[in-house]
């Protein structure tokens, strides 16, 4: 859910910045700066504790999804924008001179290369976001950290519970990292 919402938002934000859409570009830049320069924990607190003060109720799961999507969308947008800007302008000019439309140029020439260039940053951001879920327990959303704290409270085995937490994160993140390496190799352009 978070991933699909982020994919749409990050591509849209990156395209707005890349195409330099006048008013929307400033709005997107403001969103990216706000999101990237405030900690996820503060964003979660604002959503979970602040929004109900103005009549918008959220449960912990919605808070987690919205907070992670808000943060992740900005990081992914910047990763994709940097991939778009890494493409030499001559490639777009060449494609247009060969008779491709702007849409075809983006779809067949620019976007595949931008995805390839952006893939390492995308995967690093995915891993970063998965690790950021450890703060969800602050808004009563059960996550691995919440479970580890419960184990510590029940059995007073701090070292063992934290070691188990590390193993769980490795079991989750190592396959994601390997998938990222595989995707990077598969999408690499010569």
Report each predicted region and the residues it spans.
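Transmembrane alpha-helices and adjacent helix-loop boundaries
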Residues: 4-190
């Amino acid at each position: 859910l978070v991933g699909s919402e982020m994919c749409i938002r990050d591509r849209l934000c990156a395209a707005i910045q890349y195409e330099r859409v006048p008013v929307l570009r400033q709005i997107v830049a403001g969103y990216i700066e706000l999101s990237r320069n405030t900690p996820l924990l503060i964003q979660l607190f604002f959503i979970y504790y602040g929004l109900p003060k103005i009549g918008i109720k959220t449960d912990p799961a919605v808070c987690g999804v919205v907070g992670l999507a808000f943060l992740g969308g900005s990081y992914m947008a910047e990763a994709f924008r940097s991939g778009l800007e890494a493409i030499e302008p001559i490639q777009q000019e060449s494609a247009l001179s060969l008779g491709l439309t702007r849409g075809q140029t983006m779809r067949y020439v620019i976007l595949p290369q931008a995805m390839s260039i952006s893939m390492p940053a995308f995967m690093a951001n995915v891993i970063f976001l998965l690790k950021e879920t450890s703060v969800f327990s602050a808004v009563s959303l059960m996550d691995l950290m919440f479970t580890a704290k419960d184990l510590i409270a029940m059995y007073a085995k701090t070292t063992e519970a934290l070691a188990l937490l590390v193993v769980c994160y490795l079991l989750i993140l190592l396959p994601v990292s390997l998938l990222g390496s595989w995707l990077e190799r598969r999408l690499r352009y010569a």
